[in-house]
Design a protein with these regions (language model features):
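Beta-rich carbohydrate-recognition and catalytic domains
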Residues: 1-40, 49-54, 59-96, 111-113, ...
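Beta-propeller and closely related beta-sheet repeat lectin domains
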Residues: 43-46, 103-106, 289
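Extracellular and analogous surface-interaction loops
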Residues: 48, 237-246, 292-296
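Short, conserved beta-strand segments of beta-strand-rich sandwich/propeller modules, principally
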Residues: 115, 249, 297-301
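Extracellular beta-strand elements of beta-rich domains used
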Residues: 137, 241, 250, 314-316
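Disordered, acidic Ser/Thr/Pro-rich linker "stalks" and the adjacent N-terminal cap
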Residues: 157-243, 255-258, 279, 285, ...
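Trp- and acidic/polar-enriched beta-sheet ligand-binding modules for extracellular glycan
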Residues: 231-233, 257-317
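A short beta-strand element within beta-rich, extracytoplasmic domains
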Residues: 245-257, 302
Length: 317
């Protein structure tokens, strides 16, 4: 983070903070521990300034009870922080919206329009999904942050969408070599993290089930995915467009993209006779992977040769 005078600061886990040199290459001065109203392990801090107030956001707990709390200061990025009036934990799980454990993230803002967006991860199940969420922040007249209820609506495009083509996958049908069995998670969520009830009645038992149906790859939702069975040695996902139509390219958003994938794509007009279409032979880490088709086809079949056997999204243009 940098202040209006150009001074840069670094904030990191366990509430550590320090001033940086002008070239942003080194720390300078003393390393301090940020003062917070609540204790406990914390990581992924955020510092930003709005209307003369410095905000220090820090995380607490974890798993399904991951939360974000904050402190306020009118002095400097490293001093004068006090607990805000009212609830200092402003973001926590929403059972109604099916968002569990909203964790650390960052604030993006436009000072001219006073638009502030908090982008964060969801703990999800087992800490392995960690999908990215975004919600708009709102403030009270005194500068305190209003409680942010997490949801899957997002904030929409902040500019005109660069993609104007029709996604043919939305009207297609999907099938697969196998489908992973549904996974049900049962947890207890603290519904009043700012002031938990002593009798623990604010702890609510909830459960949710993830279904890995092939059609999830074509619903244009980054919250659902297709997964093959763990013992599927040759996983594939096939799409039927209903009739032969011109396809320019396909975009694949694989599960665990940072681990990389190798794959090959086939095309067909009868679902029986297949021809090679595109491939990535060596494991490549990126998202999305793009396959050039440039042909009139009805069926497409994606074989995952290496990498996690799952797909968040398959877009077809």
């Amino acid at each position: 983070s940098s202040d209006l005078d150009g001074t840069a600061y670094l904030f990191w886990r366990r509430r550590m903070a320090a001033r940086m040199t002008d070239d942003w290459q080194h720390l300078t001065g003393d390393t301090i521990v940020m003062s917070t109203a609540r204790q406990g392990y914390s990581e992924g801090p955020v510092m930003f300034k709005r209307k003369g107030i410095y905000y220090y956001i820090y995380t607490l707990r974890g798993n399904q009870n991951y939360v974000n709390a904050y402190m306020m200061s009118r002095q400097s990025p490293l001093s004068g922080f006090e607990k805000p009036e009212g609830n200092d934990i402003f973001l926590f799980s929403s059972i109604a919206n099916n968002v569990w454990g909203p964790g650390h993230g960052n604030v993006f803002y436009n000072e001219e329009t006073d638009d502030y967006i908090f982008v964060y991860l969801e703990y999800g199940d087992g800490g392995t999904t960690r999908q990215v969420y975004a919600n708009r922040m709102e403030f009270n007249e005194d500068g305190t942050i209003k409680t942010l209820v997490p949801d899957e609506k997002g904030v929409g495009y902040l500019a005109v969408s660069q993609e104007q083509r029709e996604n043919k996958a939305l009207k297609a049908s999907f099938s697969a070599s196998s489908v992973r069995s549904p996974r049900t998670s049962k947890v207890e969520i603290e519904t009043q993290p700012n002031c938990p009830l002593a009798d623990k009645t604010s702890l609510v038992k909830v459960e949710r089930t993830h279904i890995y149906h092939p059609g999830n790859a074509g619903d244009q939702s980054n919250g659902t995915r297709w997964m093959a069975e763990t013992n599927d040695d040759h996983p594939w996902l096939m799409v039927d467009l209903g009739e032969a139509m011109q396809v320019t390219e396909c975009q694949f958003a694989f599960v665990h993209p940072a681990e990389g994938h190798a794959w090959h794509l086939e095309k067909s007009n009868d679902g029986t006779n297949w021809q090679p279409c595109a491939e990535v032979k060596e494991v490549k880490a990126c998202s999305p992977h793009v396959a050039t088709v440039g042909d009139k086809v009805r069926y497409l079949r994606l074989h995952i040769d290496k990498g996690a056997a799952g797909l968040w999204e398959w877009k077809i243009y």
